[in-house]
Amino acid sequence: MDNKTDHKNDLNSQPVPSSAPHKERLTPMMEQYIEIKAVNSDSLLFYRMGDFYELFFNDAIEAAQVLGITLTTRGKHLGEDIPMCGVPVHAADDYLQKLISSGYRVAVCEQTEDPAEAKKRGSKSIVRRDVVRLVTPGTITEEKLLDPTRANYLMTLARIKTSKGEEFALSWIDISTGIFRVTESHPEKLLADIMRVDPQEIIVADSFFHDKSHKSLFNVLDRIVSPQHVSLFDAVTAERDICSYFKLSTLEGVADYSRSELSAIAAAIRYIEKTQITHRPPLMRPERQNENATLFIDAATRLSLELIRTTSGQRDGSLLKAIDRTVTGGGSRLLVDRLIAPLTTPSAIDKRLDSIAFFLRNTSLAEAIQLILKGGPDMPRAVSRLALGRGGPRDIASIQRGFEIIHGLNQLLNNELLPQEISDVQQVFSHLPTALHFRLEQALSDDLPLLKRDGGFIRPNYHKELDEMRALRDESRLIIAELQAQYAKETDIKTLKIKHNNILGYFIEITNLQATALTNTPQAKARFIHRQTLANVMRFTTTELVELEGRIAHAATHAMTLELEIFDTLVHEITEQVDFIRKAAEALAILDVSVALARLAEEQEYCRPKIDQSLTFRITAGRHPVVEQALRKQAAEPFVANNCDLSVQKNHQYAAIWLLTGPNMGGKSTFLRQNALITIMAQMGSFVPASSAHIGVVDRLFSRVGASDDLARGRSTFMMEMVETATILNHASSHSLVILDEIGRGTSTFDGLSIAWAAVEYLHEVNQCRAILATHFHEMTALTEKLDRLYNVTMKVKNWDGDVVFLHEVMPGAADRSYGVQVAKLAGLPTAVITRATDVLHQLEQGETAGKGNKLIDDLPLFSLKTTSLINEETNKHCMLHEALKNIYPDELSPKEALEVLYRLKQLEKK
């Protein structure tokens, strides 16, 4: 989760004057601003003034700094200039994005009446304004503010105190798509559950937030937590409020929610109503998540494996980046959902794998589907914007385009023998509302404006009256010319003209001599109404011309009104189909992910894993999905594949544990991570980077690879290591997979060895889980003699002319040394240090063998002038050799000359 500065508390103490005192010193507009600001003190106030949103006082100072806009002043208060800045309404989304990403909440205050209406109440009356929406990180819907590849979750965290202790529940909503989920949680897995969902904003009761016993949790979550009054989580009225929102008489038959779940759900609904104010987004009914249905991955493991983002927060370098071949926003979001919550039911996993296998066998069909899907619209987000009154013509077009894609895919899949998951997708597509699809095709213009107020989005010939209004608006000159010709013919006055001015409007003009034709009979007088007489001309009008003038004058306004009415009708029809649209969008995402994973499997030569309920863990020629692709991009040496078999061996009841030794840089951490990632990929329903894989479902995955201090909570690297190790030992079951790298390295040798030794014994005897443990404590390899399911494996290395070559192969056996000095040499440590380290290591090893370690350490000489001199001589020798080699050109030497050169080099080496 991003660590950005939290400005919410700053806004509570802004020096905005009270709305009560000093009113006589403020303009009516500023009085109104202060009254509205007082109710929204925890948010920046976007105060609508014509075509701008304006901010005042500290709001202006803060916003100007973040947005990089000019800070100016408007008026004075108590003799001081009032700071002010503003942003154009048409560009507000861009500025909102910057403010939200910087940790601010924004209250959007709009004019709620026309200025003309305000004047009717008195010349000094000001336009009414109200806050119509609170914009927060978890409640945004605008396309510009959202990442199309990422869900935007608002989470509520409820705590219920009972006689037995505390009960917790989480609910999370993506207001932009309508997704609504809920689950119970427990103190020990609360952080893991939150990190799995990865919300943009978390709502908690203020009493919970300030509870010191949970301080560490909220320190980790940092700025994304928004404390609210405890009444938001009231469980007593929760069921009533939930039923009211979803128009239900009772929750019976919907779900048997716990009290804590009801509190979390109700809090989410109340917060949505609080922030959206005038609109209720169409949410799905809360779907309960079964905690046992998905692979549990704790927060530390999720971070260290870099599933969605790297430890530095980047998408590049993550597993998601390596496997994502989706072509739609919905598909990308579904892939993330699957990646963060792998399944634990083999039949459900196989259902997904069947889809991938189908598209691998039908590559032409897969290519055709991906071509149709590519660049497809984000229907759930479009329909949410429309339902919230924030949508435009292009959102309606997104629905129409989505329907078109569904129609095409339905025809493409109709005659195929499909696997279950894709058959279900096709079944959803078959219920396309064809009448609405046809109406949208007929209604929408080809060239659509961004905003509905710009008009012109309804196609000609769709609505007769609208066509007439547009004709009057756009073709008024032609209509007047036709009427002028009609009157000229009727009166036999060829010079008759229809003209216009701001006083009379449209009128007929003839000379005084011609006026007789319009006034000589009662019928003519009744038809042509006299308006004005000038020196040489007379002016008339007709009932027809007056009516036409009125119609022309109001044509543009009426055309816009009609177009907006049609827009609202279409929006209503679309929102009536919201359930289908969401199901169809989910089906499109499933199709996108299935085809994308098939493409990945073919491209990277992945295999289908066998998944069952056994304790098997057998990977043949497994590879690290991220590292392998990185090496290919760099045109480096190919990735070295390795086997891993933690399965139950003959005459044993439980699975094996591998104890991995070997040098740094040998590939131990990569091997550990790749097996964890293969497990996640297999259980999310993906093919995996191996030649074969058989995995008994893993219920919990623990991976402790890498280490860092947690300075914010005062924890050292070693303390963090011990906390994470405690979590593993306390919660791993026989169906779990544990990946541990260098346990005990953060303390003294004997302390570390003792802890690592005891932890391995505990995993073997108590947890009885599948595990791979990497260590530098070579003494631990002796444990295989007493623990019958513990096996020694090592990273293969090769000595070549005094240097070490890492082969990155895992083989049976134990390493006899760590090759730390050789790695230091590769890293470029000074020759003096390497020479000295080699000498110290040699003497320490001799001392350990003889049992005289401490004495030898005391006897070891420090760097001396003699040592330095020898090192300098060695350096000079290398320089001479280097110079000699630099002046040799092998292609120009005869065999005899080459032999002479070799002798000279040999002489240099002996000096």
Swiss-Prot record:
Nucleotide-binding listed as a keyword: yes
Matches recorded under Pfam families: MutS_I, MutS_II, MutS_III, MutS_IV, MutS_V
Zinc-finger in keyword set: no
Region Disordered, residue ranges: 1-24
Keywords: ATP-binding, DNA damage, DNA repair, DNA-binding, Nucleotide-binding
Entries under InterPro entries matching the protein: DNA_mismatch_repair_MutS, DNA_mismatch_repair_MutS-lik_N, DNA_mismatch_repair_MutS/MSH, DNA_mismatch_repair_MutS_C, DNA_mismatch_repair_MutS_clamp, DNA_mismatch_repair_MutS_core, DNA_mismatch_repair_MutS_N, DNA_mismatch_repair_MutS_sf
Record-level GO BP terms: mismatch repair
SMART domains found in the cross-reference section: MUTSac, MUTSd
Coiled-coil spans in chain: none
GO cellular component: cytosol
UniProt record similarity statement: Belongs to the DNA mismatch repair MutS family.
Superkingdom of source: Bacteria
GO molecular function: ATP binding; ATP-dependent DNA damage sensor activity; damaged DNA binding; mismatched DNA binding
Comp. bias (Basic and acidic residues): 1-10
SUPFAM superfamilies cross-referenced by the UniProt entry: DNA repair protein MutS, domain I, DNA repair protein MutS, domain II, DNA repair protein MutS, domain III, P-loop containing nucleoside triphosphate hydrolases
Role summary: This protein is involved in the repair of mismatches in DNA. It is possible that it carries out the mismatch recognition step. This protein has a weak ATPase activity.
Gene3D superfamilies per record: 1.10.1420.10, 6.10.140.430, DNA repair protein MutS, domain I (3.40.1170.10), MutS, connector domain (3.30.420.110), P-loop containing nucleotide triphosphate hydrolases (3.40.50.300)
Chain sites annotated for binding ATP: G662, P663, N664, M665, G666, G667, K668, S669
Protein name: DNA mismatch repair protein MutS
